[in-house]
Amino acid sequence: MQCYTELLSPSGVTHALAIPFLSASAENLVVVKTSVLQIFSLLKVQHHSRGETIETKSARPDQVETTKLVLEREYPLSGTVVDICRVKILNSKSGGEALLLAFRNAKLSLVEWDPERHGISTISIHYYERDDLTRSPWVPDLSSCGSILSVDPSSRCAVFNFGIRNLAILPFHQPGDDLAMDDYEFHLHQDDLNQVSDHVGNGLKSKDSTVYQTPYASSFVLPLTALDPSILHPVSLAFLYEYREPTFGILYSQIATSHALLSERKDSIFYTVFTLDLEQRASTTLLSVPKLPSDLFKVVALPPPVGGALLIGSNELVHVDQAGKTNAVGVNEFARQVSAFSMVDQSDLALRLEGCVVEHISDSTGDLLLVLSSGNMVLVHFQLDGRSVSGISLRPLPTQAGGTIMKSAASSSAFLGSGRVFFGSEDADSVLLSWSSMPNPKKSRPRMSNVAEDREEASDDSQSEEDAYEDDLYTAEPETPALGRRPSAETTGVGAYIFQTLDRLPNIGPLRDITLGKPASTVENTGRLIKNACSELELVAAQGSGRNGGLVLMKREIEPDVTASFDAQSVQEVWTAVVALGSGAPLVLDEQQINQEYRQYVILSKPETPDKETSEVFIADTQDLKPFRAPEFNPNNDVTIEIGTLSCKKRVVQVLRNEVRSYDIDLGLAQIYPVWDEDTSDERMAVSASLADPYIAILRDDSTLMILQADDSGDLDEVELNEAARAGKWRSCCLYWDKAEFFSSTGPALKQGTRCELFLFLLSIDCRLYVYRLPDQQLISVIEGIDCLPPILSTELPKRSTTREVLSEAVIADLGESWNPSPHLILRTESDDLVIYKAFASYIKGESHTRLSFVKESNHTLPRVTTSEKEMQSNEKLSRPRSLRILPNISNFSAVFMPGRPASFILKTAKSCPHVFRLRGEFVRSLSIFDLASPSLDTGFIYVDSKDVLRICRFPSETLFDYTWALRKISIGEQVDHLAYATSSETYVLGTSHSADFKLPDDDELHPDWRNEGLVISFLPELRQCSLKVVSPRTWTVIDSYSLGPDEYVMAVKNMDLEVSENTHERRNMIVVGTAFARGEDIPSRGCIYVFEVIKVVPDPEKPETDRKLKLIGKELVKGAVTALSQIGGQGFLIAAQGQKCMVRGLKEDGSLLPVAFMDMQCYVNVLKELKGTGMCIMGDAVKGLWFAGYSEEPYKMSLFGKDQGYLEVVAAEFLPDGDKLFILVADSDCNLHVLQYDPEDPKSSNGDRLLARSKFHMGHFATTMTLLPRTMVSSEKAMANPDSMEIDSQTISQQVLITSQSGSVGIVTSVPEESYRRLSALQSQLANSLEHPCGLNPRAYRAVESDGTAGRGMLDGNLLYQWLDMGQHRKMEIAARVGAHEWEIKADLEAIGAEGLGYL
């Protein structure tokens, strides 16, 4: 009984689409990452020359406008998206267009944006999984077939090609439809396969007053052979522009294309254009172009002014216009060999078009940008004679013009207008690019002009002259014009673009290998002061492809860079205050102004009794603290509630329990203002305070509110409150500066000429949120039922509920990067749960202003349970409440900090949702912002922990906070295929590869004709050139390298504790490398086993980290490729998969590897692992399934224990021991996870010969590695465990399996006890039935795997279970009651199946 939980969501972009989604005028980008849907808005910001970025509305004249991506919403989907398209429907809720998504297994989902919910709303879900369509024995399964989705540019219909030859057609209603209502009624026709959501309402009305119940009509399915009997092998299709009726072009062949049979099946592709008659469900053939090159694989519809379609092949581009006229260009020398089709010769470009992505970048010239699989960019230009295309020309984009911005292949693209284009990638970061035209003084007219008169009047002589200038634009010597190329005036656009990066979506996929290593200390000679601020181990993975290859460091918690540490005995609170020494506070600070015009105070509070404390004042001098004498600062030793600055940093304000003290810039006393009630003279004490210049909001112990305001001189005076605020009883108060004018747009309008940026948020005792505008104290909004924690908070009255959460605090704060913070409501419960709401404005019909609402953000971070009486006593020793701390600028982030254990930051980037990151270390008593006083360093923070250590820190450099873990990417510049940590030298050894041209060997005596290869072919094939590299974790740079031969490939790199002497039995840590010599499929492959030691050498004086080097200890050439390695047994031997054998070998003193035992295998062993120290190992065959064997040392022998019966295509595998049971996890090539068990006592296992299939689970991601890791006890288990019981030992040795994937996702499989499994299984069933799932998908069907019914109890879906935390309090308790469990039990179970078991990371 196991549970699969996704720790990191996929990061590689698979699909991208530009669409006005949020409104009719919105600029949105919809991105799909395998099974995650993200909706971005394009925000124009101002970028300063020094790197500073701010919003456009506050721009300064010396800044340049740029565009950034801002995430609106993110949805995990219970399905794998295969395509997306935009559809313009009638009367959408937002006024924008709708989104049509195609999923694996023939599903379509139509969604729109709902402004009232600030999220997507599913209009319909369409299933095409019908038996009569897929039951043919010679038709592959739907999951094995590709799917193509295309929508007519006028949104009249969509076509969905699935199951090879099935075509589903989904019509959409549009204004002016003349379709008969009888043919499109709401009742489902017998041929209709739609399952409609409840989005019916009062119907949709078009301009001709025809009322439709849904935005679409009944869909129908046709076989492609109904369009034309010759369409037997469809390749690609796309709807075309500029047709009155829905018209699409399709590439197909009558016989299967084959490179091996090229001589017989040359030019076998057809391109045909069909027009659809939706009313008659018929089609008409408009044109057909036969005998096209057989390597064509994609149809790209081109908008005006070019029109027609571009057909992309491996070696050529073919344009077909509306009349069937073709223009083609060959881009390498193979184009004329594989096809007899007439084409222009540009073979000197030597391009490989396989896997390329093309996107148009100019509406005026029709130019295209083509991204190759290597990441290089090529401009495609069409020569136009009026509306007719006379030729195609290509020009590689040079590096200085941005041609190498993409480091690897693109997977998708989207043209965003205004000179912007987006390229998504699964192998590198996705990029948002802008382009500008390069000025050319030789030309008299604008480069991007598209005036028809200029085209017609230009002479051939002038055009040829301009082409000569274009040839000199990027190259040093003139190029020979391509054969058959007709010069045109439009050729002036070729190569006239410069591209630059506007924004990036970080990607860590594909994750190729993973290892654990010890982190290098970031600060030397600090001893114990930094010991607790660093994890025991760090997770390092090999990521990326091609030039984008590198490493990624994964941190479960934030490990700050500590710049200074101090002993701080008995310090409980730390405060900072920055005062301005000059006349004012300039907006932009240079290095001298930071040091001369500002002074930073650090105040440490040490309690003496619960009601008394002493304050120590320091001045921050760079990274040192110098004592400062301030006799007037808190002389009465009162308890400090808050410290801040007012009057443009001219006054320091200290809010004490009994009074408010105001100081000048030298901390001389300026004013004392009492906290008691002046009307009744009752003694009152402050319990919390909020500062926002020039106001101070103070909440007193009788739940009453007091507001002070500073005048121009800095003196404080009490603000007279209105009746409601004065008489109310409040739980929490918060002042908020609305710099983005978000709340100013909600509520009643201000008088003309006035401006308001300050708002007061009050949480009442009965949990109502009041929003007041200052200084007029106008009530803007009242939101009830805050403690019900519903998904949407608005002014509408909530449903009555008897189940409510006990709230302790509520703050409104900005979250996000400094250039684009957004307001969020953060609620803290009594049990330290954090609930995060994002503010948004929803429009109200009939009113001029918008309504303030909040939408709940996902937060699956659970608070830790106090584990021991000692810890409880240490926490209770200080009875003061520790409030949330708002951090307006910390390392260029607006964040919120929660002290305690664990201490947590709430962080958000522009491209992510808010995430709760825990701070590594002990119980944090207090934290405050600390200005590091250096222009090269970001604003940091200072905190004190329970070990009486005061640290000055900053966020780790080059760290990404876009995901639930903190990530740091390190570029290597080559693809990293394998990775190992050398424990003896504390370095990482990488197996890398890069592309290199392959040349036949000149010294081959059997093939003397190979010596003339250069005369026959210049377009050489590319193969991988491999090498080994040593990386130091101190600087993350390559310090040594070992190159391999041109035909030798690294297949495995492992760190092993090997016996190096058969006489002394000495053992040392070695790096063992397995390689394969592959020289073609007609030559048997060989292999080699290398044994290296990373030794210490004399370093370069300027590079002290270069003190390590690879030393070759042993080398053994073997028959067959060495495809997998592992250590085995207890004598320091290794086992290697070489060819079709698995052989155990021992290292001798002469460097040879002596075989001692072996086992015959069958095909290709790609997985070989031992359950450490037991001799039991698994061998995964890529074709023949999984073998479970054992190795004995006396005598040396390999024995087969069991084998799976399903002949799984093993991609990755790992052991998972669970008590006295042994499970084996296997990931196959269809993204499924199989759980096998070795149980010889079960009769079905035939005495253990068969591995029993216990369950199957669809992960949705192609697994790359599985790693068995020890599991630490989580806080709930520690709290429930008896310290005197021996059960603690049995729990601490439990293990779990970490799974990485090609999409960049990281998952974990955890064994679940029987009691917890029953509880979580019932909860999963309730959630699957009661939740509203995005796009109308079924999570149960997504995770299920079709089988013969032999599988046992299913694996739990941790991502679905965690959605219980996102529900409102009433629904949460209702479902818990149905399950028959308490809230704390479910939370303990959820904590156990997450990342908390990785306590050492």
Swiss-Prot record:
- Ranges for the region named Disordered are 434-489
Q: Give the location in the cell.
A: Nucleus
Instruction: Please explain the role this protein plays, according to its UniProt record.
Output: RNA-binding component of the cleavage and polyadenylation factor (CPF) complex, which plays a key role in polyadenylation-dependent pre-mRNA 3'-end formation and cooperates with cleavage factors including the CFIA complex and NAB4/CFIB. Involved in poly(A) site recognition. May be involved in coupling transcription termination and mRNA 3'-end formation.
Any Pfam family matching the protein: Beta-prop_RSE1_1st
- One example GO MF annotation: RNA binding
Its taxonomic path starts at: Eukaryota, Fungi, Dikarya, Ascomycota, Pezizomycotina
Q: Which GO terms describe its biological process?
A: mRNA processing
Q: What is the designated name of this protein?
A: Protein cft1
Location, primary (coarse class): nucleus
Q: What Gene Ontology cellular component terms go with this record? A: mRNA cleavage and polyadenylation specificity factor complex; nucleus
Q: Which UniProt keywords apply?
A: mRNA processing, Nucleus, RNA-binding
For bias type Acidic residues, the affected ranges are: 454-474
The UniProt entry's sequence similarity note says: Belongs to the CFT1 family.
On the tree of life, the source organism's domain of life is Eukaryota
